[in-house]
Amino acid sequence: MIHLEEIGELLEAADLQGPVAEELPRYLERIQDDPVLREDIEERSFSLLYSNILSPPSDWINSEDFLGDEGYLHNLLSVLNTLPIAFETHNRLNVPSGITRETFADIGRWTEYFQKEKGKYGLSTRITWWFTRHIQARLFSLGRLQFFIRPFPGTVLVLVNRAGETRLVARDGMACGPDGLLSENNPVFRTKYETGGEGFRGHPVLDGFVQAEKKFYPRFQWRLAVGKAFPLLDIHIPSGSSLSFESCADSIRRAYDFFPDHFYDYPFRGFMCESWFLDPRYKEVLSPESNILKFAAKLNLYPHGQNSNEGFWRVFGEGAESLAQAPRKTRMQKAVAAYLESGGKLTAGGGIVLNTEKPWGVSPPQDLLL
């Protein structure tokens, strides 16, 4: 358990500033003589350091449920308590100190977001578990983008031909609605995927939508480039500056420099991203000049998830509980509100781009080409 004399250094490492940087040491001092709460922090920190799941287990008790608002500080302290071990892991991997600072500054970014949205100091349990990726040295901030070491979950299969063209094919058993998006409640068709000596047969995925008609891809022309558990880097986009082409290209370039040096045994085949803003229907909603659409255009899109509450609170803020309460201050808020009022729905989406496609115009190292 961290001591009071260590807290200042950890606050700086997590880029925690303002009132929360004053409240957290006070909370730590208050629990010095409370063995139950100190032990609870140790247990939570242990789970963040060593659990192989990326969200709270079903039997997890939220700190805020039994501590009230102090539970958010309790969560934040549980994260900071892991940092000495997390820093040791970075040192063992020879991660440059600048990248370590960039990566763990995300704690301050999320704490600031939570204070802005909820008016509370600390972190919710949901946000706390996001940091398992940072703490376990699986996510790194490299400029505008973050990259998470994540084998592909296998929502689709990626085929390439001799000319370097890429095609996405839906995995077997996906329940799809009439629009080609996922729909477990009212499916119109379920995908079939077959492979054999002659080739691959399945439902193409075009611009994020699963096609109802199957197609055959002969093996002498096409091969499997990415399937379930194939090594990829998962892109996350933290809040911050503009999502420009140049900033994305710079981050991709840095990823090509960093990961082969520090994770040489993870020969990733490309990049993926699964997010609320990759909803393929945003083409109907947003301006063609939107950076979100420009980002999505660099990926081969596929459906991911169904109706997305995350998309709603990401656009309108966590305080908006209904469309009637939703603010309409930004162009995106106005456009999405009008879309929802006309009967539209929000979902999530995914996208993938192979190294051979030169993401954002950046050529990969030769060792990472298929």
Question: Each predicted region: which residue ranges?
Answer:
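Non-catalytic substrate-recognition and accessory regions of acyl/acetyltransferase enzymes
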Residues: 1-243, 263-270, 286-370
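Short acidic, S/G/P-rich loop/turn micro-motifs used as interaction or catalytic elements
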Residues: 239-246, 277-281
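Conserved acetyl-CoA-binding loop-helix of GNAT-fold acetyltransferases
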Residues: 243-260
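General N-terminal targeting signals
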Residues: 250-254, 285-290
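Extended, charge-biased low-complexity segments
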Residues: 270-272, 279, 284
